[in-house]
């Protein structure tokens, strides 16, 4: 029988707990002996009691029951200073983390402890990180578009409400800015919130993201309850147990906003490959036989237990955007291959577009979405998207000829195609709200209907007489005329 999750999760007093002692320590793995009949359950949190009545200092999670009243647990923090014989307390529950509005604007570790030096989190609501996926009867199976207000995404690779999106992009192509704009737009358009799970990435990147979020207003440090995001970090310097579970901590916080607050939630996981990598390390430490390419034999199960909890229910939705690192650019590697099976859309960021100064640098030809079907998005959206892709594809094919022979050697039709493709390419750029402080241009949220209308007018030749620069970094197509007239006036006054 599936139990309804309880968010007022009470962690009982530590003195009433079952007690054991450490018998073996191998790196981040502890073997703990308990009295007969006092064994903890799988996934229970164990706390190593410090010597001389000090505070408990290391939390572990039970992974295996070994027999002879012993369990094997994986530590969530460094095991430096632990010794055989130290007392271990079974908390009687899985790792439980704070949930609710008080988590917004704060940074947490895998245990739900704030690490931003802003004091304790004021909440009594805790939730265990291990839960079942929502039952089928509670799922919302309607296929609906999750409008982001970002033109290139909504038109060519739309996100599914409650779906999963893979975000592919190297360093310096605008991944962080795109993530922050999505966080900002979901808060404005849907009254939703976001949870960011930093899984096994660099500490410096996590710090930079936090600073940029404060600068752009996504995190309001004066009024934390007005912040739009909660951050959960398990960086690459932390033990594999923490990196393996930090994604579940972030997901648990997101589930509360969906199930209790009935909100639409954006869940960012950066990087989903590191989740698999940490699971592989833990699997080896526990002595399991490795599977293909050295990965854990439970790879599909672990990925499924995380991904199946990310879904839409009748209360709200969790839409997940997951950065995917592809080792050695090998898409057949078991880690990315297992991830792809769960994705509804892919957003690919292009370095060549970023080099041209076109932001967001989303590649319109490489980005894909299962939602781009006429029976889901409608005939007009589908046909416009296909015509845009065909025009951009033809432009891509002609680029080599243009580079060698020049534009004058093309036929009239091809010259017209190139001109319209360059205008579409620039029209799909957009000023972001979170980049206002850097660019000085006010951000634009563009509805899907306006994006379709704009691209249709460009393709039909309505704007063939306007310079392509007028299409750069505008919101709706109506702004193009105004920008062109302004440029004309400037040139005239010169």
Curated annotation (Swiss-Prot):
It catalyses: ATP + H2O + 4 H(+)(in) = ADP + phosphate + 5 H(+)(out). SMART domains: AAA. This is ATP synthase subunit beta, plastid. It is found in: Plastid thylakoid membrane. Its EC number is 7.1.2.2. GO terms for cellular component: chloroplast thylakoid membrane; mitochondrion; proton-transporting ATP synthase complex. It comes from Cuscuta gronovii (Common dodder). The lineage of its organism: Eukaryota, Viridiplantae, Streptophyta, Embryophyta, Tracheophyta. Produces ATP from ADP in the presence of a proton gradient across the membrane. The catalytic sites are hosted primarily by the beta subunits. InterPro entries: AAA+_ATPase, ATP-synt_VA_C, ATP_synth_F1_bsu, ATPase_a/bsu_AS, ATPase_alpha/beta_chains, ATPase_F1/V1/A1_a/bsu_N, ATPase_F1/V1/A1_a/bsu_N_sf, ATPase_F1/V1/A1_a/bsu_nucl-bd. Belongs to the ATPase alpha/beta chains family. Its main location: plastid.
